[in-house]
Structures are given as structure tokens and as C-alpha cells.
């Protein structure tokens, strides 16, 4: 699905003009982008969490030459889906505890691969 598809869906479902639907979708994406640029977490109930993480610089290895190289510090974006979304993707079936907290703040291990 593309941004144009999302705009079309908003247009069809809400009844705004295509121009209004496009402006609303653009505003939502701009707000999300600006929030993430500030390093803030975005929590969307029933959907998931977007989290910006700072990764430290580290020494890596060139797989072709074996030479050690420095990998610079950077920010990475991770997404953690809510239990509601996970259940929806699995047809309402979950292998995790039913009724798990949707706003789980235990973020250990996310984006650290």
C-alpha cells in the first residue's frame, strides 16, 4: 500500500474531497516524522509503538576482507506491534497470553540486532 492508496481510502471512507484527504494524510505523516525526529516515542493504541533508539559506534568486520571497520553511531527506528495487531494478523489467534497489555513498556532487546 502506498501513500496514494491511503489517501484514496480516506477519501472513500470519510467522504472528504481528495484534496482534503491528501492534506490530512500529509499532516498525520508530517506529525509522526517531526515527533520521531525529536526522538520521541509514538504510541498508537491497538496498533503499536514507534521508537527511536540511539546506537553507539562499534567495531565491525568487513565480511569479504575480514578487516575491522568502525560503524558510526546512528539513530534507528523500531516498530513494536501491539498485541491487538498481532492477533489480527494471526486471525485472532495468539501464542502469547490473552489480554496482554497493549502499552507494554518493556522494550528490552528491541532494535538491538
Swiss-Prot record:
<comment type="subunit">
    <text>Heterodimer of an alpha and a beta chain.</text>
</comment>
<keyword id="KW-0238">DNA-binding</keyword>
<dbReference type="GO" id="GO:0009893">
    <property type="term" value="P:positive regulation of metabolic process"/>
</dbReference>
<dbReference type="GO" id="GO:0006417">
    <property type="term" value="P:regulation of translation"/>
</dbReference>
<keyword id="KW-0810">Translation regulation</keyword>
<dbReference type="GO" id="GO:0005829">
    <property type="term" value="C:cytosol"/>
</dbReference>
<dbReference type="InterPro" id="IPR020816">
    <property type="entry name" value="Histone-like_DNA-bd_CS"/>
</dbReference>
<protein>
    <recommendedName>
        <fullName>Integration host factor subunit alpha</fullName>
    </recommendedName>
</protein>
<comment type="function">
    <text>This protein is one of the two subunits of integration host factor, a specific DNA-binding protein that functions in genetic recombination as well as in transcriptional and translational control.</text>
</comment>
<feature type="region of interest" description="Disordered">
    <location>
        <begin position="88"/>
        <end position="113"/>
    </location>
</feature>
<keyword id="KW-0804">Transcription</keyword>
<dbReference type="Pfam" id="PF00216">
    <property type="entry name" value="Bac_DNA_binding"/>
</dbReference>
<dbReference type="InterPro" id="IPR010992">
    <property type="entry name" value="IHF-like_DNA-bd_dom_sf"/>
</dbReference>
<dbReference type="GO" id="GO:0006310">
    <property type="term" value="P:DNA recombination"/>
</dbReference>
<dbReference type="InterPro" id="IPR005684">
    <property type="entry name" value="IHF_alpha"/>
</dbReference>
<dbReference type="GO" id="GO:0003677">
    <property type="term" value="F:DNA binding"/>
</dbReference>
<dbReference type="InterPro" id="IPR000119">
    <property type="entry name" value="Hist_DNA-bd"/>
</dbReference>
<feature type="compositionally biased region" description="Acidic residues">
    <location>
        <begin position="95"/>
        <end position="113"/>
    </location>
</feature>
<comment type="similarity">
    <text>Belongs to the bacterial histone-like protein family.</text>
</comment>
<dbReference type="GO" id="GO:0006355">
    <property type="term" value="P:regulation of DNA-templated transcription"/>
</dbReference>
<dbReference type="GO" id="GO:0030527">
    <property type="term" value="F:structural constituent of chromatin"/>
</dbReference>
<keyword id="KW-0233">DNA recombination</keyword>
<keyword id="KW-0805">Transcription regulation</keyword>
